[in-house]
Amino acid sequence: MPSHSLAFDHVHVISKDPHATAAWYVEKLGGHVVKSTVVLGAPQVYVSFGGPMVIVRGQRSAELAADKPGLQWGVDHFGLKVQGDFDGFCAGLRSQGVAFSMEPTDANPTTRIAFIHAPDGVSVELLNRKDQ
């Protein structure tokens, strides 16, 4: 029997403006800021969606950040499950000026998905599973 277990905890986003980015996740997607602090010299804001969190931090003094165009190896996006009226939720985001990289579509007979652009080049998948 293993002496440990694992559970998903967070997605970590590095942002040019962590407080504005955290506010975007709150205002557009309904997250809640549960903590705002400084870690290793950079502001860090914890945004909860009722489970694993999005942690948004700023640039540390010794770091150099750069924008990354195009497809990159590694993490591509993170997904948020939408319960309820998926198309209505997406329409509400669109009315707030949120840009979609993929419009709502049926991924399979039981799942609708869409992709939106979040601050700092982050891609967020929205999904609604009819069987859950």
For the regions a language model picked out, list residue spans one by one.
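Vicinal oxygen chelate
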Residues: M1-H4, A7-K16, V45-S48, A66-Q132, ...
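Core segments of cupin and vicinal oxygen chelate
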Residues: H12-V54
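Active-site/binding-pocket entry motifs
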Residues: M53-V54, S61-A62, A99, Q132
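Generic preference for hydrophobic
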Residues: V54-V56, L126
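A short, acidic/glycine-rich surface segment
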Residues: S61-D67, M102, P109
